[in-house]
UniProtKB/Swiss-Prot annotation:
GO terms for cellular component: basement membrane; collagen trimer; extracellular region. The modification Hydroxyproline is found at residues 232, 238. The gene is COL4A3. A motif (Cell attachment site) lies at residues 106-108. There are six type IV collagen isoforms, alpha 1(IV)-alpha 6(IV), each of which can form a triple helix structure with 2 other chains to generate type IV collagen network. The alpha 3(IV) chain forms a triple helical protomer with alpha 4(IV) and alpha 5(IV); this triple helical structure dimerizes through NC1-NC1 domain interactions such that the alpha 3(IV), alpha 4(IV) and alpha 5(IV) chains of one protomer connect with the alpha 5(IV), alpha 4(IV) and alpha 3(IV) chains of the opposite promoter, respectively. Interacts with ITGB3. Belongs to the type IV collagen family. This is Collagen alpha-3(IV) chain. Residues 1-241 are annotated as: Disordered. One of its GO terms (molecular function) is extracellular matrix structural constituent.
Length: 471
């Protein structure tokens, strides 16, 4: 018969045994490129080798910084070896000759000299007049009668002859011994002071400090409340009868009290004690004995600077001003002082007018020197000569000026102020004073020494300000 229809598919048989690996097939057609999804972040790699140094960066902007706050005091350094003996300075110019003194009083007469040698015999003089008749002799025996004689005429004696000529003068006698010395004549007037000696060799220039960053200007503070009315002052001295002659000097109290003028002088005005200023890294000092050191207004930056472009700038640079200070204690945290808190730290001063010039006399010992004859004392103090601060800049004080004789001694007699409105004491501020000297050790090598607080006044020279008395 015919073949039957195809039957249904049977069940799958059991898997066969693994066949032998067939030959490698021909390469297939390239597949379609489909971007896959981003894989997960891999683990961090190991540290790579250091790269080559990059090129130098551009220069920074030239911004001047402000001075940092005062740091803590360092440990005292070891004592250095003694310095070598310095060269002897050149002698000063000779002073002008003094005015000749008045002639002394006449001395007592000297002793008589020895008698001179016997003179030569003089010429014979004319015969002198006859002498008086002699006494009668004894009566002789009678003579023999003579012959009659002639009449004899007896004439009268003639007049005396002229005196004989004077004999030749005798030889000069030996000089007598010198008479006793005469009384000393009165002292001549005081000679003029000699010319100033040549200036000393300048000291080494200090290293320039780093400029700090300029701080942002803070907002102006609000005005404080007005202070209470002060008590009335003491009654001043009576006015002098004489007319003032225009001799002006300044007196500094080194406290917050306004000083009074000495007796016999009159006040012109009062103010605040300016010592020196520093601008563009250059310092200029004021003579404390003149009225320029007594400003009637106080500010931490009393000056401004202008350029050739007709532009002026105020309180916008790293400039300084320095003022005589008071004994007020600085804050424990050494923070800069600003605003109304500055008032207790600034010394007051008074400008006075006197009838004559005022000078300072320095003893260079711990004894107060006397005023010259004909001068009166105005005040006594300590011999102040020089001061330096930021950038080793500073100024000196004329020793003839009343400003070189401060009535109070302090190792830090001035305070530093800045244009940003703050003031403080800093470790690079130094004061220089005349030392007390032993007259027996002149022209000898000074003995190095270090004197601590409590004994400082024992090595500082004393001084006195004197004024010429009115005639």
């Amino acid at each position: 018969g015919l073949p039957g229809r195809k039957g249904p598919v049977g069940d799958a048989g059991p898997p066969g045994q693994l066949g032998v690996t067939g030959p490698q097939g021909a390469p297939g057609f390239p597949g379609v490129t489909i971007p896959g999804q981003k894989g997960d972040r891999g683990p961090p790699g190991s540290r790579g080798n250091p790269g080559m140094p990059g090129p130098p960066g551009p220069p920074g902007s030239p911004v001047e910084g402000i001075k940092g706050d005062k740091g803590l005091m360092g440990e005292p350094g070891q004592r250095g070896p003694p310095g070598a003996i310095g060269d002897m300075g050149s002698p000063g110019h000779p002073g002008a000759p003094g005015v000749p003194g008045q002639p002394g009083a006449r001395g007592d007469p000297g002793f008589y000299g020895f008698p001179g040698m016997k003179g030569k015999k003089g010429n014979s003089g004319f015969p002198g007049p006859p002498g008086p008749p002699g006494q009668s002799g004894p009566k002789g025996p009678p003579g023999v009668r003579g012959e009659p004689g002639t009449v004899k005429i007896i004439s009268l004696p003639g007049s005396p002859g002229p005196p004989g000529s004077a004999g030749e003068p005798g030889m000069q006698g030996e000089p007598g011994p010198p008479g006793p010395p005469g009384d000393p004549g009165p002292c001549g007037p005081k000679g003029k002071p000699g010319e100033d000696g040549p200036p000393g060799t300048p000291g080494p220039t200090g290293e320039k400090g780093n400029k700090g960053c300029k701080g942002e200007q803070g907002p102006p503070g609000s005005d404080g409340l007005p202070g209470l009315k002060g008590k009335p002052g003491d009654t001043g001295p009576p006015a002098a009868g004489a007319v003032m002659r225009g001799f002006v000097f300044t007196r500094h109290s080194q406290t917050t009290a306004i000083p009074s003028c000495p007796e016999g002088t009159e006040p012109l005005y009062s103010g605040f004690s300016l010592l020196f200023v520093q601008g563009n890294e250059q310092a200029h000092g004021q003579d404390l004995g003149t009225l320029g050191s007594c400003l009637q207004r106080f500010t931490t930056m009393p000056f401004l600077f202008c350029n050739i472009n007709d532009v002026c700038n105020f309180a916008s640079r790293n400039d300084y001003s320095y003022w005589l200070s008071t004994p007020a204690m600085i804050p424990m945290d050494m923070a800069p002082i600003t605003g109304r808190a500055l008032e207790p730290y600034i010394s007051r001063c008074t400008v006075c007018e006197g009838p004559a010039i005022a000078i300072a006399v320095h003893s260079q010992t711990t004894d107060i020197p006397p005023c010259p004859a004909g001068w009166i004392s105005l005040w006594k103090g300590f011999s102040f000569i020089m001061f330096t601060s930021a950038g080793s800049e500073g100024a000196g004080q004329a020793l003839a000026s009343p400003g070189s004789c401060l009535e109070e001694f302090r190792a830090s007699p001035f305070i530093e102020c800045h244009g940003r409105g703050t003031c403080n004491y800093y470790s690079n501020s130094y004061s220089f004073w005349l030392a007390s000297l032993d007259p027996k050790r002149m022209f000898r090598k000074p003995i190095p020494s270090t004197v601590k607080a409590g004994e400082l006044e024992n090595i500082i020279s004393r001084c006195q300000v004197c004024m010429k008395m009115r005639p």
